[in-house]
Amino acid sequence: MTKEEAKKCIKKLREEINYHRYMYHVHDKLEISEAALDSLKHELFKLEQHFPELIASDSPTQRIGGKPLPAFKKVTHASPMLSMEDVFSPVELEAWLTRNKRLYPLGIYDFYTEIKMDGLAVSLVYENGLLKVGATRGDGRVGEDVTQNLKTIEAIPLRLRVPSEKEISDVILRSETTKDPEPRVKHGILRFAQDDAHVVHHKILRALEQGRIEIRGEAYMSKKTFEELNREQKKKNEAPFANPRNAAAGSIRQLDSNITASRKLSFFGYALSGDLGLTTHEQAHALMKLLGVPINPLSEYCRNLKAVVDFHEKVYKMREKLPYWTDGIVVVVNNDQTFERLGVVGKAPRGIIAFKFPAEQATTRVREVRFQVGRTGVLTPVAVMGPVFVAGTTVKHATLHNMDEIERLGLKIGDTVILEKARDIIPKVVQVLPKLRTGQEKTIRPPS
């Protein structure tokens, strides 16, 4: 094969592999088997090995780097990666909206809601459409350059896709008709969408050819991968990861990108910045998808707070069946101008809030232990605790099952404990916090 023939073949293979990456990670469609896709990658790899001068930084073969890095470089974010305030009830959510309306009464207050992922926030900077820098959030202003590790995540595009003007027109039309679906405005909206799409498309092409686009999102580990990883940790007599966020963070901060690649992380985008002519958060989400960036399909436009609360309840009910962990939803003021006018308080934008699910764990103090006699005469110890609100209910009692469980926990009367009440199961003491002991605690003894 001549170099020119190899060049054409390599181009076609890259396009084919990138197409299937886009269809799988963005549209959740697997059009060919993983084995067939691996075969295409292997063919591309062999060609590039034979013609190394044709290797490009955005080739699918370049996701995994070579030698481990000695250390991570620091990266200053173009704009701070801020945090969010939390609310835990519809009443608190209403209070948040009231404060914002008081601050900016002329604002447009509709909302875009998405899942609050339990992962690691990262920034992806694309220059001329090519992934240039991937960084952790760090302290919000300065993060760490983990570009090589983020490249190993298949869901993250190495080069952004170029959307058509029609695709952009459809996005703008769809976002406008969700706000005002009345037939009387359809003609005006269509004309507006077409005019707007032309401007946005021109700006996107310019940014992809000679500009800068930043995608922010969440690198996360699925439930299945997390469980598999901890099984492997135990086999190697290494400490298991405490939670999926720690696992994702630990995987991203590996100096050897081969280790990161083996952890099988995933990614969802949630924010887009650049001079693109967009007007709403909803449009930004839709455009990310057109650019080849996966977004969480469980994201919804909400006309008012009632719709937000309904979305919150829907996700709460289905959370156990989701392939990832979540502890709430994120509510964003949809209109970009309103969002910007609301500004920032402390380290959190006023236009975004985390609407958390009822906590499934809480701390409380064991006041006494009572022993109940069952029908078969078996004694069951029951902890009487200070009332605590957990998983949507107030809990005062928790079974301790037997003395073996008390001994395993190292529990004493007066101890501060972590109480868990997940789903519909009965409350359970899962951990004692011995460092909070005062010396007044008492040993638990069964009745003689």
Residue ranges and their predicted role:
Residues 180-181, 196:
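Compositionally biased non-globular segments, especially hydrophobic aliphatic-rich helices
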